[in-house]
Structures are given as C-alpha cells and as structure tokens.
C-alpha cells in the first residue's frame, strides 16, 4: 500500500499534514478498517518513516521486530518489520521507503526475501 491517507493537497507528492494523518488513520481508522475487510497475511507500506507518527496505524497487537536503515542500490532506506493482530490472525508488516525508480531490482529482491522469510 502506498496511501495510508486517501486524500492529498498535491497531485504528485505527499504533502499530507500530520493532523490529517492522525485524523484519517487514528480517528477515522480508514486503514485498519480496510485491513479488517481485506484480511491480508502481509502488508507492505511504502511510506518511509513519515507516517510513523500514527504507528501502530490503528492495528491491535502491534509489535516491532526490526527497525533500521538498509542500503538499497545507491539509497539508504528506512526498514521496519512488525506484526499485528487482525481478528485474531497474525499479520506480518513491512514499512519501507518508496524506491522511486532507483535500485528497483535490489529493492524488489529485499522485499521478496522478507515475504519468503515471513511466510509460515
């Protein structure tokens, strides 16, 4: 998922204010309601750390497993692995920066490795 908040003040870049993030994610619970409907086993958030102010993104049982920065191609990206519980089921989460077309092959490989590591 690339959009935790479904509205924006700019057609090309994320200029979502912190108050809008809090309102949409924590108060309206748009993201957590979507997750309950979709019932995923894995979630990848391409938001970087700019949405960490609304962490745990309205999800229960949120537990951080690994938080660091990782080199991807020529970039260094934020990388957060976590689990949450949705309707009694574990959900694996990865919050990472968006590759923006740079080092895409390395980025895809890292995310793929994460998915493989976390599939039961």
What spans do the regions from the language model cover?
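Short, surface-exposed acidic-centric catalytic microdomains
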Residues: 1-15
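Short His-Asn-centered micro-motif
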Residues: 2-3, 45-48, 96
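Oxyanion-hole/transition-state-stabilizing segment in secreted/luminal serine hydrolases
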Residues: 9, 48-52
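Catalytic core of non-heme Fe(II) oxygenases with the double-stranded beta-helix
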Residues: 11-17, 39, 43
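C-terminal capping/extension of enzyme domains
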Residues: 14-32, 51-120
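Proline-aspartate-enriched helix->loop->beta-strand connector
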Residues: 31-48
């Amino acid at each position: 998922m690339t959009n935790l908040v479904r509205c924006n003040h700019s057609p090309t870049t994320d200029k979502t204010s912190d108050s809008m993030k809090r309102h949409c994610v924590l108060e309206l619970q748009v993201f957590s309601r979507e997750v309950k409907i979709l019932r995923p086993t894995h979630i990848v958030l391409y938001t970087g750390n700019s949405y960490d102010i609304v962490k745990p993104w309205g999800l229960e049982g949120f537990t951080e497993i690994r938080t660091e920065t990782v080199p991807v191609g020529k970039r260094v990206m934020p990388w957060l692995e976590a689990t949450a519980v949705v309707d009694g089921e574990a959900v694996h989460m990865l919050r990472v920066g968006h590759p923006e077309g740079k080092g895409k092959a390395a980025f895809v490989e890292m995310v793929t490795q994460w998915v493989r590591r976390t599939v039961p």
